[in-house]
Amino acid sequence: MACENNLVVKQIMDLYNQISNLESLKPSKNVDTLFRQLVSTCLPTDTNIDVTEIHDEKVKDMRSHLIKLCGEAEGYLEQHFSAILGSFEDNPLNHLHIFPYYNNYLKLGKLEFDLLSQHTTHVPTKVAFIGSGPMPLTSIVLAKFHLPNTTFHNFDIDSHANTLASNLVSRDSDLSKRMIFHTTDVLNAKEGLDQYDVVFLAALVGMDKESKVKAIEHLEKHMAPGAVVMLRSAHGLRAFLYPIVDSCDLKGFEVLTIYHPSDDVVNSVVIARKLGGSNGARGSQIGRCVVMPCNCSKVHAILNNRGMEKNLIEEYSAIE
């Protein structure tokens, strides 16, 4: 259980206090240093801290606010580098390495592609990314290195973010044709989501539990049966940086895998399939969710409404 007296939590709270007192979260030497320190403090996976078991209200409030500050700073960082990349006279995609977290996106994209390949029998023709932002690196990495014939539809509520993002791919002969940008609040749209084989939900869409669950419920209502949703989550100390998506939040979906990286890729990955299609029929009676401990990681048991049959969902960690 995490509390104020825990040394690591104290360090996180100290960094939170410094960050929350900054005049601006836009990239600067001070901002960059503080967030680097925060990330390095939260990266270790050899910890018994489970933020879902926190009962200290001060720590809980701090975590909620810190996640929002991290999201705001990440948005500014992406805007900053997207504008720089867009100013290159040649193809901006040739210079993606200048973005400080580009290697993380390469690793995350490979991880998500591998997980997707394990649970799908065909290559997706159309993918939606909700909350793509000014620097849609997940879509770019997947399109460029893993899904060369797939069309990516990127949705963001911010028109300026989409302008910056579309400029990044506008001089690439391939991606300029396969990356499409939509300025809309897709979570208010009732049509269109059923045309995608795979839907990605960005970590920054739904920064608190209530809004994250609301976004998931909207996807469940409007995605095609059998389509796959991929979400970003967090585990251990990393949940001080990003919201957690629990399998219990995914009502109407069959959760296939929850993967917790142990390297410098911060986000956990959750992959689930919309029930109702041929693949999801066996999970149509899913009711409540129970977490069961195991020696190497954790296994989620999904019980049906009668509490009799069990379907095991794979949840594994790279710490083994």
Curated annotation (Swiss-Prot):
An annotated Gene Ontology molecular function: nicotianamine synthase activity
UniProt KW keywords: S-adenosyl-L-methionine, Transferase
Family annotation (InterPro entries): Nicotian_synth, SAM-dependent_MTases_sf
Key word Transcription present: no
GO biological process: nicotianamine biosynthetic process; phloem transport; pollen development; pollen tube growth; response to zinc ion
S-S bonds: none
Superkingdom, natural source: Eukaryota
Documented EC number(s): 2.5.1.43
Catalytic activity entry: 3 S-adenosyl-L-methionine = nicotianamine + 3 S-methyl-5'-thioadenosine + 3 H(+)
SUPFAM superfamilies, sorted: S-adenosyl-L-methionine-dependent methyltransferases
Role noted for this protein: Synthesizes nicotianamine, a polyamine which serves as a sensor for the physiological iron status within the plant, and/or might be involved in the transport of iron.
Family as reported in the entry's similarity comment: Belongs to the nicotianamine synthase (NAS)-like family.
Protein name in the entry: Nicotianamine synthase 2
Organism listed in the record: Arabidopsis thaliana
